[in-house]
Every structure is written in C-alpha cells, then in structure tokens.
Amino acid sequence: MGLVTTKEMFEKAYNGGYAIGAFNVNNMEIVQGIMEAATKNNAPVILQVSAGARKYANPVYLKKLVESAIECNKKSGTDIPVVLHLDHGPDFETCKDCIDTGFTSVMIDGSKYDFETNVALTKRVVEYAHPRGVVVEAEIGKLAGIEDDVNVKEDDAMYTNPDEAEEFVKRTGCDSLAIAIGTSHGAYKFKGEPRLRYDILEEVSKRLPGFPIVLHGASSVPQEFVKMCNEYGGNIPGAKGVPEEMLRKAASMAVCKINIDSDIRLAMTANIVCPVLTGWIFRQFWCIIINVSTKEMCLKAVRMRITAVHGVLS
C-alpha cells in the first residue's frame, strides 16, 4: 500500500465515528514501536514530524525510516494505511520542502497570525500541495502549552470561533482543520477538572458537515509513566492529560485525527531513567537494552491510544 494521504482515511473515520491517532516520531525506535502497535491492532496510523524532529533527524532520513517500516510490514504479510505528516509547519518554505521530500500530508500552522494572514498563507500552501497529491491541515484558534517551537502562554490561548472556522475552510480549501476546544500542548492539559468545549466542536461540525476536524494536545498522560519518571528523579507533579472517554466522545463528533506526543515522550523518559538509575544496565549493553526497551514502551503507549480512539480495519 505504501504511503497514503488522509483523504480516504478521514472519510472512513468520519463515517465510522472514530479517530485516527497521529503520533510524533523522531527516531527508529519510536517508528518501530508505533508501526508494530498499529499493525497488531490492524489500524491506520499517521506518523508526524515536528519542527524539532526535523532539526534532530533530517526529514529525508525520517521518510526513509517510515518507508522501511512499511516495507518490513509488506514482507511480513501485513499492510496498513500509513500517512507521513508534517506537524506545525511554521511557513510555506517548510511545507514545500516536506511536500517535495515525499510527505503525503502537511500542516501549515498560521494560528499565530491574524485571520486574513492565516487565510492567505494556508491558501498558498494548499495551491502548492493539491496539484502534487498532498493534503493540507490548517489551524484556527490557539492552544496553550509548549511543543518544540510552538509556545503559547495560557493568557494568549483562544477558543476557535465557529463562524471563522466555516469561512476559513471555504476560502482556503484546506482538507482538515485543527480547532481549539480546551486541550493544550505538553503534559499539563488542565489546572482543574478536565473540560472540553464540545459545544464549539458541535457548532463547527454543523457548519462544516462531513469535514474532518483535528484535535491537538490530546495525550492522556498515563499516570503509570508519570509515576515512573517522578520515582527516578523527575519532577512533573500534577501532570494531567485528556481522559480517554473525552477523546472517544470527540471522535464521535467529527474529530478524525487526534495528536499524541507527550505520551510518547513520557514513555521513553520513564523507560530510560528507570533501568539506568536502578543499575541493571551493564555498560557494554546499555545501548541495546535502551533501544529495545524504548521501542517496547512506545508500543505500549501507542496501543493504549489506539484502543481508545482508532478504528480497526476489517
């Protein structure tokens, strides 16, 4: 099957009332863990590359890793839909580079700009991407929190306006839209009880029937990973994610893509600091043990999210 776009994937998800998990990747172990988890669940998956991952591991390198994982799947007799996606593309040039590299989906994040500038920037990316068979995700509204180069203070966060969302999609021709309904980037999603603005989501979906909505900052922040990190020198008290039942409800209301990054980072951190600090890594084997165990922990984190929101292929 090779790499695909989100077009058919989102159409099936929308009609089926489920969402596709989009997981951030930046090395071989994460790619292996995500692909193995998706394959075991026979589920479609989106592998996405952030600005930080582009700096750390060249996008060409990451594309080859993903293609190799797909090829390994084919040789083992399994074949699932896989999308390679640019997460939070900051400008036209970055999106163009990823499109030219062979990504099948890109996100242009113009949410930091005023409405008209965001429209113009997104439309420019769409006009370049569509003739090349690439789909475009855009964003309107601002999520609080930090993710790589994306840093929005809580006071600057802004819920999505449904009127603007409708106009934005019609004027830009984007293929999916990330909206702000109360989630945030990072491991601290909520100060008090978790609350999402389903009323905004419902209104947007009414104005844009059949159109796929994206939910950023949707990690559930498993407490077992938080506990492991804190027990071995970490300091992330009170970390709180989006409960799985909230994700399932969002998936039943037009959300077709749910972004997961913090869960992967927590899984990796927990699995590295625990064996290192408890002393059961022998010096000559530490690289092998960390690489294998990191993949397994990423696999576990991804399967938890897939169970919550993914559709299972027939």
Q: What is the role of each PLM region?
A:
Residues 6-12, 28-52, 60-77, 89-212, ...:
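Alpha/beta enzyme core
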Residues 230-236, 242-276, 283-284, 296:
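C-terminal alpha-helical cap/extension of soluble enzyme domains
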Residues 216-220:
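Short catalytic/ligand-gating loop segments at beta-alpha or beta-beta junctions
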Residues 20-24, 84-85, 107, 213-215, ...:
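Short catalytic-loop micro-motif centered on adjacent basic/acidic residues
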